[in-house]
Amino acid sequence: METRRALLVDAFTDEPLAGNVAGVVPAADGLTGEEMGRIAAELGASETAFVLDGEDGTDERIRYFTPTTEVDLCGHATIASYAALFAENEVDSGDRTLRTNVGDLAITVESDGTVWMRQNPPAVDVLGGGDEDDDTDSAAPLNADRLGDALGIDPAALRDIGADLPVAVASTGLPWLVVPVNFLQHLGRADPDAAAIEAISEECDVAGVYAFTFDTLEADSTLHGRAFAPAVGVDEDPVTGTASGAVGGYLRAVDAFDGEFPEELRFEQGHFLDRPGYVRVRVGAVSSGSDGASDVDLRGESAISVAIGGEAVVSMDGALRLPADGDDERGIIEA
């Protein structure tokens, strides 16, 4: 019976059982998409990364699966994969090129094991200030009342900040609906309606809703975020790399900071799930005329570079038994 090594890796943390757990299958060549989906369901992590040999000059190829579907990109599973490969001496520190469903991404592994993932140039589509109707094709307007009801947050907490920070769809490869909230007490008490969030996600063609506040638990943090993605099988994601990069691009696009944009941002997330983690985000201008220009730029620059970074630690290392050809039973985990 065929076996495959399978890891559970906690990303955006240096401690086991914190951050965001990802499944990682470090040698996934030969697996079919159906087998990858079944393995992801068996491991039960919000996303599982399947590491394949690179194509067309790239170093690696990764496919990402939730327990229910394939997704084009997953930040925390990417960080988890490279941190695990580096810890096993399967990759060296330095720069690598990763192929994903959204294109080729630049990865940097630092000598201390920190992994940086450069994402696609961000695209930001501002929908409104939280109280007026949006331009989507939804039957019900996407205003503060509807968003507040879906998130289980007092709509006043959205209106209070919406005049300065609009609701928007932001993407660096995987789109998210970005919803600012005034204070952490409101974000922390969120009681989301999964069906309502799924409906909004489908209408806006996004993976989920990322709600954030500048009111943080730690003084060093830029913001506190929560990510809800029932449309892709994840009611709440503890720490979300793709959303963090997208929100970094959003913050620059809407001029969220007075003066110079910070050199590096620190996003805290997962505390209300007892899985605290921290995403480092770098957002910078690419010189005029560079490839990949995006409509994110509201500052006269032609393109924006976004990278997310963090650490990760292996919390489980085991073997997955695959059923023989023609056997419909699911595999089981052997520690």
Predicted regions mapped to residue ranges:
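N-terminal lobe of the biotin/lipoate ligase/transferase fold
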Residues: E2-E70, V91
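Active-site environment of divalent metal-dependent phosphoester hydrolases
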Residues: T32, A80, A219, G233-E236, ...
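Non-transmembrane, aqueous-exposed alpha-helical and coiled segments at domain scale
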Residues: S287, A324-A335
